[in-house]
Regions:
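Carboxylate-rich, polar loop motifs that coordinate divalent cations or form catalytic acidic clusters
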Residues: 1-210
Length: 210
């Protein structure tokens, strides 16, 4: 924690147990639930939930043979406040749905030969769009339907979209445009209403490009 106004730093250390601190020194994305708890993605330590009121931690880590998170390398997280669902994207473990009311996990993974499954088990970002989720993966972007568990891969069959493989980050702006950070391909914008996909690549000859 850092407060730039007062130059106050607080360090949150790792530990061997939940009572001692974080489960991993490598942390990534975070979100906050309705109770003010911080949900922290880690690399190798699963998801850590930090209760700021009583300064305690809860770890969600993979446990073989039990209902648990599918992988401990966690890259993305999105909190559905209305339905009390935490959506968790993992590296090699697919997409996880944690129902906070029951504390049960449901895992969605890539299935060979099934076009309605995830395009990759490496999930890098999750953003909401209407009643669905836009999911960034190592193999493009898909529109995930939480009600059915089915994925619709976006623009992969189009000429403009074939080059989109590994996607690092997503953002939907106030006008409903989806912005896609594609590794090695620059930035794309996508309009759901028209299906228009536009690429903004790096051009060494153009100093005004990315």
């Amino acid at each position: 924690y850092f407060n730039p106004e007062y130059e106050i730093y607080t360090r949150y250390k790792t530990g061997d147990t939940e009572k001692e601190g974080l489960s991993s020194p490598i942390v990534g994305r975070m979100t906050e639930d309705k109770d003010g708890n911080l949900w922290i993605c880690t690399e190798g330590g699963g998801v850590n939930v930090y209760n700021r009121k009583d300064n305690t931690y809860r770890w969600y880590r993979h446990e073989e043979g039990k209902n648990s998170i599918s992988h401990n390398n966690v890259k993305a997280i999105y909190y559905d406040r209305t339905n009390e669902i935490m959506w968790i994207g993992t590296h090699l473990g697919g997409l996880n749905k944690l129902d906070l009311r029951t504390n049960r996990f449901t895992v969605y993974r890539m299935k060979a030969g099934d076009p309605t499954s995830l395009p990759s088990d490496i999930v890098r970002d999750i953003v909401p769009y209407k009643d669905k989720l836009v999911v960034a993966t190592q193999n493009g972007v898909c529109l995930f339907n939480p009600a059915t568990g089915a994925c619709q891969q976006l623009f992969k069959e189009t000429k403009e979209g074939r080059g989109i493989g590994m996607v690092a980050s997503l953002c939907i702006d106030k006008d409903g445009t989806l912005w896609i950070a594609a590794t090695g391909e620059g930035v794309y914008s996508y309009r759901f209403d028209s299906g228009k996909l536009t690429n903004y690549p790096h051009n060494p000859a153009n100093p005004n490009s990315l």
